[in-house]
A protein has these predicted regions:
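Conserved helix/coil segment N-terminal to the catalytic DExD/H
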Residues: 41, 48, 89-132, 140-146
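Walker A/P-loop
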Residues: 30-49, 59-62, 171
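Post-DEXD/H (motif II) to motif III coupling segment of the RecA-like Helicase ATP-binding lobe
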Residues: 126-197, 215
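Conserved nucleic-acid-binding Ia/Ib motif block in the N-terminal RecA-like helicase ATPase lobe
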Residues: 58-60, 65-114, 118, 192-195
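Conserved interdomain hinge at the start of the Helicase C-terminal
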Residues: 205-225
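Pre-Walker A (Motif I) flank of P-loop NTPase domains
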Residues: 29-35, 56-57, 105-107, 167
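Conserved pre-motif I regulatory segment
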Residues: 1-38
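Conserved nucleotide-binding/hydrolysis micro-motifs of P-loop NTPases
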Residues: 65-67, 89-91, 115-117, 139-140, ...
Length: 225
């Protein structure tokens, strides 16, 4: 299916949101991506759609167990096989998921960054055809950010061990210039396509008023709205 057909069939949208198609096209062309898109802008579609168009496996690295579960549940509900690998699984469940992954059952696998360097996961990754790595909450790699997680620093080391370098997409909702530079450097992005979208909300505006009677102004505003 084309990207438009996948968008409609699995996600129910007729058109892409701002920035999504450019990111998808870059990933499909084999270019690394650094995308800064606000919460609710549809970052997940930016890697889920190309994941379904690539031949191999897409690993989605996420620090949040609850988010992994929600994403996998949503994908399974629309007919997309996906799994997550994190500490919420029992040992038996974890190794069963890895066995299914080796058999090619899942085009999309969510994994916690702490799992990347474990012996069992590395054994899987070194023999798997990993076509793309999507790093969610990628600002966690930067010590400039308030959500720094040392486990994110292992991502580049993990990628370096793979027999074939996959395309890498780094996604975050917010990042300063320093954090963006850290993301690109610490994840080893190669000449990435960079985009920042969605922060100009036409339905929102800021205004400053200096009324003589503040209480009347507030009272009238409440009555009006």
């Amino acid at each position: 299916m084309t990207k438009q057909e996948l968008l409609k069939t699995h996600f129910g949208y007729d058109t892409f949101r701002e920035g999504q198609e450019a990111v998808i096209d870059a990933l499909l062309a084999g270019k690394d991506v650094l995308a800064v898109m606000p919460t609710g802008a549809g970052k997940s579609i930016c890697y889920q759609v190309p994941a379904l168009m690539m031949k191999g496996i897409t690993l989605v690295i996420s620090p949040l167990i609850s988010l992994m579960k929600d994403q996998v549940r949503s994908l399974n509900q629309v007919g997309i096989s996906a799994a997550y690998l994190n500490s919420s699984l029992t040992q038996g469940q974890y190794f069963t998921a890895l066995r299914y992954a080796k058999a090619g059952r899942y085009p999309i696998i969510y994994v916690a960054p702490e799992r990347l360097t474990t012996e069992a996961f590395l054994d899987f990754a070194l023999s798997a055809d990993i076509s793309m790595i999507a790093v969610d909450e990628s600002h966690c790699v930067s010590q400039w950010g308030q959500d720094f997680r040392p486990s994110y620093l292992k991502i580049a080391e993990f990628v370096a061990q793979l027999p074939k370098r996959p395309v890498i997409g780094a996604f975050t909702a917010t990042a300063t210039k320093e954090v963006r530079e850290d993301i690109a450097r610490l994840l080893g992005l190669q000449n990435p396509f960079c985009t920042t979208t969605g922060f100009d909300r036409e339905n929102l505006y800021f205004a400053v008023k200096t009324p003589k009677d503040k209480y009347k102004e507030v009272h009238d505003y409440i009555l009006e709205h």
